[in-house]
Amino acid sequence: MRVLQVGLGNIGGGLEAFVMNYYRELSKMDVQFDFVCMYGKIAYEKEIKTLGGRIFYVPNVKKNYLGYVKRFKQILKKGNYDVVHVNMLSAANIVPLRLASKAGVRKVIAHSHNSSCPGMVRKFMHWCNRARIKKICHRFFFACSEVAGRWLFGNEDYDAGKVVIVHNAISMERYLFSEDHRAIVRSAFGWGNRFVVGHVGRFDPQKNHEGLLDIFKEILKKRPDAVLALVGSRGGQYENILERVKSENLEDKVFFLGKRTDIGAFLSAMDVFLFPSLYEGLPFALVEAQANGLTCVISDTISREVNVIPGQLKPLSLGTSPEKWAETVVRAGKRPRVGKEEIYQGLVEGHFDICREARRLKKLYGE
């Protein structure tokens, strides 16, 4: 079976992690992925090629619409794909869905990975295109969570059972707590026995780094030994956050760690995970943090479907004061980590175990 994956970029964020987690497993089951990318460079390029995937670079649809359409049609014609799987952060661009449907692809999937989007123009396009998606994809609606499904496909179709939840599953072994990794990372950055508050996320408005810094300043009043470890690629907010850290003399307490491939090691170095996002589909970062045994203090905008283990998530309203957030973070940091057996049980029961979920996705592709 050959599947064309659309929607991956060069960031290496949650969407890309979703596809690669499944690809690593499905490639062992005679399911091969190819990829269309319009961003000049795709994340995980080397690994994709190692697994046997082909990468097709196309013009950016916003800058060269006709060139995008022409190249995409060529790819579909030569590829003879069983499935075209379009991963979407919004419905602003439905061109690949339309082209795949017109080309006669047996199964064209629209997959919602988000629950909102920035910008008035994009929001307008999203709402205009929602109805068109239903005509193109018929019954092949995927979403990472209920809130993501309702946002892209609407309440009527979700309540009618037309949306399939495909979970953001992970390989537990990649994220399990390691005392050795904790010691190595803490030594490398000079953290010693300090109180490490961690966050993983691209520097975009959605992740609310401004609010995160407000909370961290209150944490310092209660735990002067605290440090903030920020893991994530540079986005539109990076320079603003960097400048604020400098202007508020927090440079020795806030660490910009960049995009990492060894996320499990950095999670092991943390004492608590802080995630005050403005909105999310279903964040991989929270599944990974829970797999490491961390207690996570999160915004209540995030779907409870991400709760792997009861009691491990501590949700708070974004309207709650930074001081109250800080109190919750400090308390959460005192809780012991969850053990391996409980984590595994939670991942399996919550449908976050990649081995099981990959088999399910293969079956969905074949239906």
Region locations from a protein language model:
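Aromatic "clamp/platform" in nucleotide-sugar-dependent glycosyltransferases that forms part
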Residues: 89, 259, 278
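A short helix/loop element that forms part of the nucleotide-sugar donor recognition site in Leloir-type
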Residues: 176-190, 243
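N-terminal strand-loop element at the rim of the active site
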Residues: 5-70, 234-238, 364
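A conserved mid-protein helix/loop that constitutes part of the nucleotide-sugar donor-binding site
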Residues: 13-21, 195, 199-218, 239-240
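A short, active-site helix/loop in glycosyltransferases that binds the activated sugar's phosphate group
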Residues: 136-176
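Active-site donor-binding acidic/aromatic loop of nucleotide-activated sugar
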Residues: 237-240, 251-260, 266
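Short hydrophobic beta-strand element within catalytic cores of glycosyltransferases
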Residues: 35-37, 286, 295-300, 305
